[in-house]
Swiss-Prot record:
Keywords of this entry: Ribonucleoprotein, Ribosomal protein, RNA-binding, rRNA-binding
SMART domains: KOW
Pfam families in the cross-refs: KOW, ribosomal_L24
GO molecular function: rRNA binding; structural constituent of ribosome
Protein role: One of two assembly initiator proteins, it binds directly to the 5'-end of the 23S rRNA, where it nucleates assembly of the 50S subunit. One of the proteins that surrounds the polypeptide exit tunnel on the outside of the subunit.
Top-rank taxon: Bacteria
Gene Ontology terms: biological process: translation
InterPro entries in alphabetical order: KOW, Rib_uL2_dom2, Ribosomal_uL24, Ribosomal_uL24_CS, Ribosomal_uL24_KOW, Translation_prot_SH3-like_sf
UniProt similarity note: Belongs to the universal ribosomal protein uL24 family.
Gene Ontology CC annotations of this record: ribonucleoprotein complex; ribosome
HAMAP family: Ribosomal_uL24_B (MF_01326_B)
Name by which UniProt lists this protein: Large ribosomal subunit protein uL24
Subunit and partners: Part of the 50S ribosomal subunit.
Length: 107
C-alpha cells in the first residue's frame, strides 16, 4: 500500500517544475494526501460553466484552480529564489523544522 504523505503542506510557497504552468509560484491552498495532489493558487486554472440553481445563486462562467500532482511542485526558498530540496532538523528545544538544503535557511 502506498504511503499517504506529501512533501508540501497547506500554506507552503511552491514552484511548479513541469507542465503547462512550469515556473509559476503560488501558495498551496489545499492538499489531498490520499490522491497525492495539491491545489496551488493561480496554477492549473480551469473554466467551469455553472448553471443557476436558485434565483439567489446565479450561474455563469467561473475560473477556479484544479488539483495538480504533488510531484510537479517543489518547495520554494525565498532566500535562494528558486525551488529547492529540503531536509528536516531538530532544534535544541525539540522542535522539528524544514530547512533548505542549498542555503541552510529555515523554510
Amino acid at each position: 500500500m502506498a504511503q499517504n504523505k506529501l512533501h508540501v503542506k497547506k500554506g507552503d510557497m511552491v514552484v511548479v517544475i513541469s507542465g503547462k504552468d512550469k515556473g509559476k509560484k503560488g501558495r498551496v491552498l489545499q492538499a489531498f494526501p490520499k490522491e497525492g495532489k495539491v491545489i496551488v493558487e493561480g496554477v492549473n486554472v480551469v473554466t467551469k460553466h455553472r448553471k443557476a440553481t436558485r434565483p439567489q445563486k446565479p450561474g455563469g462562467i467561473i475560473h477556479q484552480e484544479a488539483p495538480i500532482h504533488s510531484s510537479k511542485v517543489m518547495l520554494y526558498c525565498e532566500n535562494c529564489g528558486r525551488g529547492v530540496r529540503y531536509g528536516i532538523k531538530i532544534l535544541e528545544n525539540g522542535e522539528k523544522v524544514r530547512y533548505c538544503k542549498r542555503c541552510n535557511e529555515t523554510l
